[in-house]
Amino acid sequence: MLVLGIESSCDETGLALYDTERGLLAHALHSQIAMHREYGGVVPELASRDHIRRALPLLEEVLAASGARRDDIDAIAFTQGPGLAGALLVGASIANALAFAWDKPTIGIHHLEGHLLSPLLVAEPPPFPFVALLVSGGHTQLMRVSDVGVYETLGETLDDAAGEAFDKTAKLLGLGYPGGPEVSRLAEAGTPGAVVLPRPMLHSGDLDFSFSGLKTAVLTQMKKLEAAHAGGAVLERAKADLARGFVDAAVDVLVAKSLAALKATRLKRLVVAGGVGANRQLRAALSAAAQKRGFDVHYPDLALCTDNGAMIALAGALRLARWPSQASRDYAFTVKPRWDLASLAR
């Protein structure tokens, strides 16, 4: 089965072709980072308009790269939610228009399910069941993944997502957009232990997260730094130490909660997905913990940590292989800007 996947939930336009026998044939991605940088964040209207401009050229790109023709495609999967309403509508409209014109069925995919399953795109995918740490700009969750569509929420953030805390910390430190990678780069120049920040809910006894207090701690420290240093090299070094303190605190919490989830479920496989999963400090800490505690940790390829069409094509193919009745030829689609992943549980 050959499935075309279309992702447009936020500020990346992604298209891909996934075959259930041959794997990922081609994927193409356009990021809107440069366009949104001058605004310091994603502008929804601009994001939607850019998806319109980019989708069809990306479609031509994946068809050419894969050697596939439209007649070879068996179904079209699209991100139905959650995400920005306008951006979702663009992707859904394009998917259903193509499906109508080509006489193909469609399937709407939960964006987070795509992330959860994205590590299955590697050469040696982890078998079910596993614990998944889903960590991105909008979500931080620990899930037990027993099979496609069989998900149990073990813990989640009670306020800010980890990626959101990274982005807000970047703004407090006067860094550019996107904030997460900028904070991580600055942190690598900081001195470990020079600034020690709180580890929220580290000993809460559950698997939930909270990052708003950590963000507030960064704000408090930044005000002290600005009062003590008028500027110059001293302030820049102090900001690097603060960034290091923030990243160390966030990573400590993510690792500790992941270990607790593995212990609670008695599983030995951890999958990390979402944009923050590309963070080098997080990967290093999890790898060290895995070696010490005797569990396996799996990630998608770095290029597939961000939003992409490959994960949507994969999720669509896996769902249709298990539940062919989910294929739809009713092109009166809806999108779901808010959509609880737990609602997919079978």
Swiss-Prot record:
Family: Belongs to the KAE1 / TsaD family.
UniProt GO MF annotations: iron ion binding; N(6)-L-threonylcarbamoyladenine synthase activity
Classification via NCBIfam families: gcp_kae1, T6A_TsaD_YgjD
Record's protein name: tRNA N6-adenosine threonylcarbamoyltransferase
Catalytic reaction equation(s): L-threonylcarbamoyladenylate + adenosine(37) in tRNA = N(6)-L-threonylcarbamoyladenosine(37) in tRNA + AMP + H(+)
Necessary cofactors: Fe(2+)
Localization terms from the record: Cytoplasm
The protein's role, per its UniProt record: Required for the formation of a threonylcarbamoyl group on adenosine at position 37 (t(6)A37) in tRNAs that read codons beginning with adenine. Is involved in the transfer of the threonylcarbamoyl moiety of threonylcarbamoyl-AMP (TC-AMP) to the N6 group of A37, together with TsaE and TsaB. TsaD likely plays a direct catalytic role in this reaction.
Transmembrane region(s): none
One Pfam assignment: TsaD
E.C. code: 2.3.1.234
Chief location: cytoplasm
Enzyme class per UniProt: transferase
UniProtKB keywords: Acyltransferase, Cytoplasm, Iron, Metal-binding, Transferase, tRNA processing
Top-rank lineage group of the source organism: Bacteria
GO cellular component: cytoplasm
Cofactor binding: number and manner: Binds 1 Fe(2+) ion per subunit.
List of residues binding substrate: L134, V135, S136, G137, G138, D167, G180, N279
Binding locations of Fe cation: H111, H115, D307
